[in-house]
UniProtKB/Swiss-Prot annotation:
NCBIfam families: hemH. It comes from Nitrosococcus oceani (strain ATCC 19707 / BCRC 17464 / JCM 30415 / NCIMB 11848 / C-107). GO terms for molecular function: ferrochelatase activity; metal ion binding. GO terms for cellular component: cytoplasm. It is found in: Cytoplasm. SUPFAM superfamilies: Chelatase (SSF53800). This is Ferrochelatase. It comes from the Bacteria. Its main location: cytoplasm.
Length: 368
């Protein structure tokens, strides 16, 4: 096997810290063919669907990829923006804002965005970090609550890429940040602002992406971390019991998923006489199909049709300044102990040390 190395390595290269900001991914276009490619990649991940591979291959290729791409493409068409996929657009802005915030704090750190499925890929992002001289790598999946199907899958993808490298970097990963104070306060700020601008509903629905219940029973901590996030957020907002409720959305298939289901709960509230609700989705760092179409559009129609009168979706944190500060704090927390090009005497001193290293290497026969 040919491993990727530094055939043109310069011995005055300053080791840098690289941060891979990772997200799930998105189709490249709101078309059936693009959605088919995305679903084929996403649903082939054994972390996402834990079924025997031969059986699942038959279901996926014999049924799902034949009937689902067209209707899912229509859903994407309802939220597609001039600059493309909302998830990709917002994730890029998060990456750019995170880079700017780190720069403003005097950090010499390279940020790259990589998608688990689709483009820009994790492999491409890691290669760009390698070419920039990143010898210390922090993997930052934008999933506040850990699940094997998301964060675990990201680690698998990173490990697969690094297995092809000759010089593997030092590696760390932010596995979850569901109870981080900056993250919780950023969420609380967006909700308070919504209440101030448009009034407060009778109930706050705190909705997370669902998972099959058997994943919880198998030891996945996702459900517990969602519960903790919701409880801590409600406490920050001063909400009493009965003024808020956690729920889980986006289920597919026939098996039991985490409950209560968001659509069932919203319908029950409307039928019970609840007229005004606010909805927030703390598990989504950026807005995407599941928030903009499912929660902001489809479940709004369900609630109003069942007798509700006001339904307000509160957007994801996206590139809100409080969110970016929280993410930057997390990066700084997790790189403690790693030196940077602007530490240990500053950039000039570091550059001088690198040049001395190069001169010693040249004396030993190095090319550059």
């Amino acid at each position: 096997m040919n491993f990727k190395g530094y055939s043109d390595y310069r011995h005055d290269t300053v080791a840098r810290i690289g941060v891979l900001v990772a997200s799930l991914g998105t189709p490249e276009a709101p078309t059936a063919s693009a959605v088919r490619r995305f679903l084929a990649s996403f649903l082939s991940d054994p972390r996402v669907v834990e079924l025997p591979r031969p059986l699942w291959w038959l279901i996926l290729h014999g049924i799902i990829l034949r009937i689902r791409p067209s209707p899912v493409a229509r859903l994407y068409q309802s939220i597609w923006r001039e600059d493309g996929s909302p998830l990709l657009s917002f994730a890029r802005r998060v990456g750019q804002s995170l880079q700017a915030e780190l720069d403003s704090r005097g950090r010499s750190i390279e940020i790259r965005l990589g998608m688990r499925h689709g483009s820009p890929s994790i492999e491409t992002a890691l290669e760009e970090l390698r070419q920039s001289g990143a010898q210390r790598l922090l993997v930052f999946p934008l999933y506040p609550q850990y699940s094997g199907s998301t964060t675990g899958s990201t680690f698998d993808a990173v490990a697969q890429v690094l297995s092809t490298w000759r010089w593997v970097p030092e590696l760390r990963m932010i596995a979850q940040y569901h109870d981080h104070s900056g993250y919780l306060e950023a969420l609380a700020e967006t909700i308070r602002r919504s209440w101030k601008e448009a009034g407060r509903g009778e109930r706050l629905l705190i909705s997370f992406h669902g998972l099959p219940k058997r994943y919880l029973l198998a030891g996945d901590p996702y459900h517990c971390q969602c519960q903790k996030t919701a409880r801590l957020l409600a406490e920050r907002l001063g909400l009493k019991e009965g003024e808020w409720q956690i729920a889980f959305q986006s289920r597919f298939g026939r098996e039991e998923w985490l409950k209560p289901y968001a659509d069932h709960l919203l319908q029950a509230w409307a039928e019970a006489g609840i007229k005004r609700v606010d909805v927030v989705c703390p598990g989504f760092a950026v807005d995407c199909l599941e928030t903009l179409e499912e929660m902001a559009q489809r479940n709004r129609e369900l609630f109003l049709h069942a007798g509700g009168e006001e339904y307000r979706y509160i957007p994801a944190l996206n590139d809100e300044s409080a969110h970016i500060r929280a993410l930057t704090d997390l990066v700084e927390q997790h790189i403690q102990g790693w030196s940077e090009a602007d530490l240990g005497g500053g950039r000039e001193a570091t550059g001088q040390a690198a040049e001395r290293s190069r001169q010693r290497a040249l004396a030993l026969g190095a090319k550059q």
